């Protein structure tokens, strides 16, 4: 298992393909699996790898919560597609002599046990929620205006990046390009969200992270279902 060399374009492409239908490296919540892979990536993936970039920006936002993310961090080769071998160069040996602080926490045995317990609790809660299937789920229909930088922005790529955002309780709908003047068109895209899982702040944060294509995002219409 692995992603190849995550410091190379080829390795980042493998990561991007792997995340095309996943929000996280493992499971349904950010975990130490995401931390391990995040640490191996030397920086933000390029904008054309929109799945990898969306994941990178999302995991980066958990920097303050890194110690409490569930799971036990394993070797990088334990994650990713089964048919790819990990060849990412590790800086673990060299970094022992440095004064740099590890971006994502320690391998403390006690902390790992606590993290494992926390992960099992969260998974149990998730399975419990799934099994209960509440009779009424509050949902909203949202129409978003996503504006590009100029008339040279690749709108097909912009829409691909937007639709790459996946979350439990989020379903993308129809879209169209609407002229705004000077040859510029904005993307108008519909989505349905479960109110207790997905909010407009989260959507705005993840959409505007694709800043090579996206200038801004506005909520054009918001209706309870």
From Swiss-Prot:
Q: Which SUPFAM superfamilies match?
A: eEF-1beta-like (SSF54984), GST C-terminal domain-like (SSF47616)
Q: Which range is the signal sequence, renumbered to this chain?
A: none
In what residue span(s) does the GST C-terminal domain sit?
Answer: 2-90
Q: Which GO terms are recorded in the biological process aspect for this UniProt protein? A: translational elongation
Looking at the record, which segments are called Disordered? 78-115
Instruction: Summarize subunit and interaction data from the UniProt record for this chain.
Output: EF-1 is composed of 4 subunits: alpha, beta (alpha subunit of the eEF1B subcomplex), delta (beta subunit of the eEF1B subcomplex), and gamma (gamma subunit of the eEF1B subcomplex). Interacts with elongation factor EEF1A1.
Q: What is this protein called?
A: Elongation factor 1-beta
What lineage is on file?
Eukaryota, Metazoa, Chordata, Craniata, Vertebrata
């Amino acid at each position: 298992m692995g992603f190849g060399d995550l410091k190379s374009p080829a390795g980042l492409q493998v990561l991007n393909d792997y995340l095309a239908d996943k929000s996280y490296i493992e499971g349904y919540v950010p975990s130490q699996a995401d931390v391990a892979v995040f640490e191996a990536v030397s920086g933000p993936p390029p904008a054309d790898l929109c799945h990898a970039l969306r994941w990178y920006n999302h995991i980066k936002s958990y920097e303050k919560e890194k110690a409490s993310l569930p799971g036990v961090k394993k070797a990088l080769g334990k994650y990713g597609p089964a048919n790819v071998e990990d060849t990412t160069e590790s800086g673990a040996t060299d970094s022992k002599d440095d004064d740099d602080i590890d971006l994502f926490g320690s391998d403390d045995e006690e902390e790992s046990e606590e993290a494992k317990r926390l992960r099992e609790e969260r998974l149990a809660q998730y399975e419990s929620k799934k099994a209960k299937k509440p009779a009424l789920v509050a949902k909203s229909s949202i129409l978003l205006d996503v504006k590009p930088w100029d008339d040279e922005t690749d709108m097909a790529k912009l829409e691909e990046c937007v639709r790459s955002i996946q979350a439990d309780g989020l379903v993308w709908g129809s879209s169209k390009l609407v002229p705004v003047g000077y040859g510029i068109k904005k993307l108008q895209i519909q989505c349905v969200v479960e109110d207790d899982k997905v909010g407009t702040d989260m959507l705005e944060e993840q959409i505007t992270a694709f800043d090579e294509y996206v200038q801004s995002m506005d909520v054009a219409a918001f209706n309870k279902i």
